[in-house]
Regions:
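ABC ATP-binding cassette signature C-motif
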Residues: 1-251, 310-539
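Extended non-transmembrane interhelical loops and adjacent amphipathic helices
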Residues: 111-114, 184, 281-292
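Short hinge/gating elements
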Residues: 119, 268-270, 303-306, 403-405
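Short amphipathic coiled-coil heptad-repeat segments
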Residues: 134-140, 265-269, 285-290
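ABC ATPase nucleotide-binding domains
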Residues: 249-263, 267-269, 276-285, 301, ...
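Proline-centered turn/helix-capping motifs that create local helix->coil transitions or kinks
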Residues: 275-279, 289-299, 375
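Amphipathic heptad-repeat alpha-helical coiled-coil/stalk segments that mediate oligomerization
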Residues: 295-319
Length: 539
C-alpha cells in the first residue's frame, strides 16, 4: 500500500529519521507512538506530502487515494459544512463542480463533456455523495440544521468534527490522522472507534488516547532513535510486551555485564604478572568476543508521579447541597447534591466542559455559586490541578525557584532536594534552570503535578489532567492515581483513565445530577442511564 524507502529527515543538526525503510500494508490500522519530540506528527506530514524529506522517498500504490485529517481549522471558512466534507474526495468534488457549472450553461457543445462527467460521477457513487456526507456529519454530532452553515460560523470544536468527516468521506484507500479524538466527546469517540474497527482499508494514526489505540489498532508503529518498527497487536499488548521484554533483556544484560567486569578485573590484577600474562591475554580475547545483549536506552522517560498524604482523611470528605451555577444566563448545572466519602474516586463529567470547570472553581473558592453550599471535611486538605494553568507561570523564575515556592520544610527548600524532585519529573540537569515562561504545555502540567505532590493532600481535584501530556506521562499518572490511598474527583477525556481510576460517576446537567457507583464503561453501557441523560439535557 505505502512504502517508505531510505527516509531521512533532519532539521539543522537534529536528526529525526535516519534511513527508515518500512511498509504499511493494506487493511491494517497502525497506531504511531513515540516520545514527545520523536517525530510522530512530522512523519505523518512527510508521508502525506506536506513536508519534503531530507532524503529518501514515499511510494503510494498507483490508483490509491490518500485522505489526511486537515489540521488547518480555518482553511474552509468560505465553504459550507456539507461542501467541506465533499471536498475530502478531491476527484469527485472536481467532477461535481464542473458538472454543476456546465449545467448552468447547458448546450450541444458541452453535452458530450457532461455525459463523460456523469459516467465518472456514477462510477464514484457520486449521486449518493450528498446523502453520504450528511450521514457522516450526523454521526459526528453535526445537526442537519448546520449542514449548509458556513465553516466560518462554526465554533472550533465543531470545525474539528467537520474536518474529521471530510477525512473519512468516500472510503479512502489510505487514511492518515493526527490526534483525531481531540475535542470529541466519549459518544463520538465510540462511534469513530466502531467505524474504524470495521474499516477495510489502511489507517495510520497518531493518538495519545490509549483506549482508542486499543479499540482500533491492528499494529503499533513505534518511533524511537530515528527508526520505525511495527508490532502486531494493539497498544496494551505492545506496552505489556515491551515492559516484559525490557525486564528480560535487562536481566540478561546484567549477567553479561557482571561477566565482563569479572574478566576486566582479572586482567587489571594479573596482566603485570609474568607467570599469568598468557592467561590474561586469553581472557582479554574473551572480552572482545563477549556479545553483550544490551538494551539500547529508550528515548522514553516515565516521570515518577507519587502522591503521598500528610495525614489520612476521616470518613467525611465533601458535602454539596443544592449547588447551582450559570454563565451569562445559561444554566451550567442546577441543584447538585453530593456526598463524597473516603476512598471515592469520582469521574466528574458533563456535556458542557464549562460546567465541570465551574464546579472545581467553586470548590476551590475561585468562583461563587449562584446558590447552594459545600463543606469540606475537617480532616481533609485539597490539591487542585486546573485545566488552565497559565497564571501560575507568568514569571521568570527558574524551575528550581518556581517549585521552591511550594516547599513546606527547609529540607524541601534545599536546591539538591528540589533538583532531585524535578529530575524524577524529567527535568534533569540544565532543564531545571529553564524559566517558567518558556515551558511547553506538557512541561507546565508536570510542574503543576510536582506542586501537587509537594502539598501531600488527601483529596485531589483534577480538571482534564492528561491535557498536553505524552503517553509515558499519562501512563505514570494513571498508575499513580490507581495506587493513591486518598480520594479523587477528576474530569478527563481519556477513556482509559476514567475506566481504570474511577469507582463512581457523577454527571452534572442543567437539570440536576446523575450519580452512580460503577465503572465508567458500565455507566456508558447502561441503557436506562442513557435515557435519563437525554432527559436531563432536554435532548
Amino acid at each position: 500500500m505505502l512504502t517508505v524507502n531510505n527516509l531521512s529527515v533532519q532539521f539543522g543538526k537534529r536528526v529525526l529519521f535516519d534511513e527508515v525503510n518500512t511498509t504499511f500494508t493494506h487493511g491494517n490500522i497502525y497506531g504511531v507512538i513515540g516520545a514527545n519530540g520523536a517525530g510522530k506528527s512530522t512523519f505523518l506530514k512527510v508521508i502525506s506530502g506536506d513536508i519534503d524529506p531530507t532524503s529518501g522517498h514515499i511510494h503510494l500504490e498507483p490508483g490509491k487515494r490518500m485522505s489526511v485529517l486537515n489540521q488547518n481549522h480555518n482553511m474552509f471558512d468560505e465553504h459550507t459544512v456539507l461542501e467541506t466534507v465533499l471536498m475530502g474526495n478531491k476527484v469527485l468534488y472536481a467532477v461535481k463542480k464542473e458538472m454543476d457549472e456546465l449545467y448552468l450553461d447547458y448546450n450541444d457543445a458541452n453535452a458530450d463533456r457532461i455525459g463523460e462527467l456523469q459516467v465518472q460521477f456514477e462510477e464514484m457513487n457520486g449521486w449518493n455523495a450528498d446523502s453520504d456526507a450528511a450521514a457522516m456529519l450526523s454521526n459526528l454530532g453535526i445537526t442537519e440544521a448546520d449542514h449548509y452553515t458556513l465553516m466560518a460560523d462554526m465554533e472550533g470544536k465543531m470545525k474539528v468534527r467537520v474536518l474529521l468527516a471530510q477525512a473519512l468521506f468516500g472510503n479512502p484507500d489510505l487514511l492518515i490522522m493526527d490526534e483525531p479524538t481531540n475535542d470529541l466527546d466519549f459518544e463520538t469517540i465510540a462511534w469513530l472507534e466502531n467505524f474504524l474497527a470495521n474499516y477495510e482499508n489502511t489507517v495510520i494514526v497518531v493518538s495519545h488516547d490509549r483506549h482508542f489505540l486499543d479499540a482500533v489498532c491492528t499494529h503499533i508503529s513505534d518511533i524511537d532513535f530515528g527508526k520505525i518498527n511495527h508490532y502486531s497487536g494493539n497498544y496494551t499488548f505492545w506496552y505489556e510486551s515491551s515492559q516484559l521484554a525490557a525486564k528480560q533483556r535487562a536481566q540478561q544484560n546484567k549477567k553479561a555485564e557482571e561477566k565482563k567486569q569479572e574478566l576486566e578485573e582479572f586482567i587489571r590484577r594479573f596482566s603485570a604478572n609474568v607467570a599469568k600474562s598468557k592467561q590474561a591475554t586469553s581472557r582479554k580475547k574473551m572480552i572482545s568476543k563477549l556479545n553483550i545483549s544490551e538494551i539500547k536506552p529508550s528515548s522514553r522517560r516515565y516521570p515518577a508521579i507519587i502522591f503521598d498524604q500528610d495525614r489520612e482523611a476521616g470518613d467525611q470528605i465533601l458535602n454539596v447541597e443544592n449547588l447551582s451555577a450559570s454563565v451569562d444566563g445559561e444554566v451550567l448545572f442546577k441543584d447538585i447534591n453530593l456526598n463524597m466519602a473516603k476512598g471515592d474516586k469520582i469521574v466528574l463529567f458533563s456535556k458542557d466542559s464549562r460546567a465541570t470547570t465551574a464546579f472545581y472553581e467553586i470548590l476551590n473558592n475561585e468562583q461563587k455559586a449562584d446558590s447552594g453550599t459545600f463543606d469540606w471535611g475537617i480532616t481533609t486538605n485539597q490539591a487542585y490541578l486546573p485545566a488552565e494553568n497559565h497564571k501560575y507561570f507568568e514569571n521568570d523564575l527558574t524551575l528550581v525557584d518556581w517549585l521552591r515556592q511550594y516547599a513546606k520544610t527547609e529540607e524541601e527548600r534545599d536546591e539538591v532536594f528540589i533538583r532531585g524532585f524535578l529530575g524524577k519529573m524529567i527535568f534533569s540537569g540544565e532543564e531545571a534552570l529553564k524559566t517558567s515562561r518558556v515551558l511547553s504545555g506538557g512541561e507546565k502540567v508536570r510542574c503543576m503535578l510536582s506542586r501537587m505532590m509537594m502539598e501531600r493532600a488527601n483529596v485531589l481535584m483534577l480538571d482534564e489532567p492528561t491535557n498536553h501530556l505524552d503517553l509515558e506521562s499519562i501512563t505514570a499518572f494513571n498508575n499513580s492515581l490507581k495506587n493513591f490511598k486518598g480520594s479523587v474527583i477528576f474530569t478527563t477525556h481519556d477513556h482509559e483513565f476514567a475506566q481504570t481510576v474511577g469507582n463512581r460517576i457523577v454527571e452534572l446537567t442543567p437539570n440536576g445530577v446523575i450519580d452512580r457507583y460503577m465503572t465508567f464503561d458500565e455507566y456508558l453501557d447502561d441503557e436506562k442511564i442513557q435515557e435519563q441523560r437525554k432527559k436531563m439535557y432536554n435532548l
